[in-house]
Amino acid sequence: MSTNPKAMTAETRQWLKDYFTYDWPSSRTAGLDRYYWTGFKLIEEIGEGESVLDVGCGVNPLKRHITNLHGIDITDIGSDEQVAIEYFKTEEKYDVAFALGSINFGSYDTIRDQTESMVNALKQKSRIYWRCNPAHRDHGNDKVKDVPFFHWRLEHHLLLAKRFGYEVTEFMPDKNRYYVKWERE
């Protein structure tokens, strides 16, 4: 747990949990069919036998397609484990992580701390696939104005990837979001 005073407060985390449980539009696909690079195409990126940690999995739509996937989320709408990434503890180390819109809220310090927690759950040789919202308030409901989006930019990915020993190998638009791939040998 972070002792950083700029880390996400319990009140903000509860607000986000309520928002994504009750106000966020959900479906069986969780919107994955709307995106190309960060949608169902990600299934093709996973090699046989690779293990995947899906951070902020929501309704866990990739679970039925990827055998070794463990989904965590602050909501209980479909995750394998209801926990925030900052509090996720595991002995297992994963080959791949998905952060498809989940590490996307709060200050830079919160993003850094959450990223560090995710990286700590990964093997040395690993990949991270990101879908980042560059602070577009396009959820289609009135409460979105109160969502504490982080304003993602390429520079943030380059800085954080370097900090944790990764290289940004892909960065491109995916509809109104960014698709980013980090790799570490």
Located regions from the model:
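Class I (Rossmann-like) S-adenosyl-L-methionine-dependent methyltransferase catalytic domain
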Residues: 2-88, 109, 127-185
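Generic structural signal for beta-strand residues in well-ordered domains
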Residues: 45, 120-121
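A conserved beta-strand element that flanks and buttresses the S-adenosyl-L-methionine
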Residues: 98
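A short, conserved alpha-helix within the catalytic core of class I
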Residues: 105-117
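Hydrophobic adenine-recognition pocket in adenosine-nucleotide-binding enzymes
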Residues: 102
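Helix-to-beta-strand junctions that scaffold the AdoMet/dcAdoMet cofactor pocket
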Residues: 106-107, 122-124
